[in-house]
A protein has these predicted regions:
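Acidic, surface-exposed loops and disordered segments
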Residues: 1-136
C-alpha cells in the first residue's frame, strides 16, 4: 500500500491537543495543502484562515457559546472543553455560495497533510455560524 493510502486510512478525529504550537514549516505546508485543493472550474471559491492567537480563540469560543445558547448538557461541558478543543492552531474555511464540495475538498487536503505530519485534526462544521454575516 502506498504512503498516501496509509495516511488516508490512518487519519481520525482527534479532540485532545498538545499545547505547543505547530512549527512555521508545518503551518506553511498546511497552507500549501489548502491552496493546492482543486475546485470546480478552478473557481477557487474557498478561503482559509489560520488562527493561532490564544486570546482570539477564547473570544471565538465565547461568541460561539452565546450564539448557540449553551444551556444544554452537550454545550455546558464547553466551559472546560472549548469548541476548538484547545488546539493551538484553529483553521477556518470559508466557501462562497454553494461551494460546499470545494470546501470539503480543501478541508480533506488539510486533514491528510496534517496527518502526514503527525498532527491531529477535528472537523467542526458548526462554527461557521460565527461568520454568517460574511465577516472573516
Amino acid at each position: 500500500m502506498n504512503e498516501v493510502m496509509k495516511t488516508i486510512l490512518k487519519r481520525q478525529t482527534i479532540r485532545e491537543y498538545k499545547p505547543e504550537q505547530i512549527s512555521d514549516e508545518q503551518l506553511e505546508a498546511l497552507k500549501q495543502a489548502a491552496l493546492r485543493a482543486p475546485s470546480g472550474r478552478n473557481g477557487q471559491p474557498c478561503h482559509v484562515r489560520f488562527v493561532q492567537n490564544a486570546e482570539m480563540l477564547k473570544e471565538m469560543n465565547t461568541d460561539f457559546k452565546e450564539l448557540v445558547g449553551y444551556d444544554t448538557p452537550a454545550y455546558t461541558r464547553w466551559d472546560t472543553n472549548p469548541v476548538y478543543h484547545n488546539a493551538p492552531t484553529f483553521i477556518v474555511l470559508f466557501a462562497e455560495g454553494e461551494s460546499y464540495m470545494d470546501g470539503g475538498i480543501m478541508c480533506e487536503n488539510i486533514c491528510i497533510a496534517a496527518e502526514g505530519m503527525g498532527l491531529g485534526t477535528c472537523i467542526i462544521a458548526s462554527v461557521g455560524a460565527l461568520f454568517a454575516d460574511g465577516n472573516e
